[in-house]
């Protein structure tokens, strides 16, 4: 498995982070490529933040309202705060996924304004580039990086 990520804070929490004092904050962003071992994630009570998962290649399986949903390359899956999260990837499918966790008082409005929901959005190399930029900026944390990654996230919404 290849697992690359960047985080806003120097510590991590499986529950995520909630910040309703600001409009929008990216907590963390990452890339995973599963080639040798299967992977599963179970968060029965969800997280405190939002999560967007983009299937760049391969596929993944998501349990939503007791139904198993098969997501393929070019699909996104959105999880809202407190929404149960159960998903898994099989190494035989060699999935490559990008994910981002975010919080803030305007997140729901942003998703609604841009009509972002779990669906097929298609293959998009620009998505890959933007996710990689966000990961890189979260790792380096140069001056002004939070503004830069928020801008990158907006690019994801309009692509």
Where are these regions (language model features)?
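Generic protein-terminus/edge-of-domain signal
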Residues: 1-70, 118
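Tight coil/turn sites that cap or link beta-strands
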Residues: 36-39, 73-74, 82-84, 92
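A short, compositionally biased micro-patch
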Residues: 55-57, 80, 90
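Short acidic-glycine-tyrosine-enriched beta hairpin
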Residues: 66-80
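Ligand-binding loop in jelly-roll beta-barrel domains
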Residues: 82-106
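Amphipathic alpha-helical segments enriched in hydrophobic/aromatic residues interleaved with Lys/Arg
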Residues: 109-159
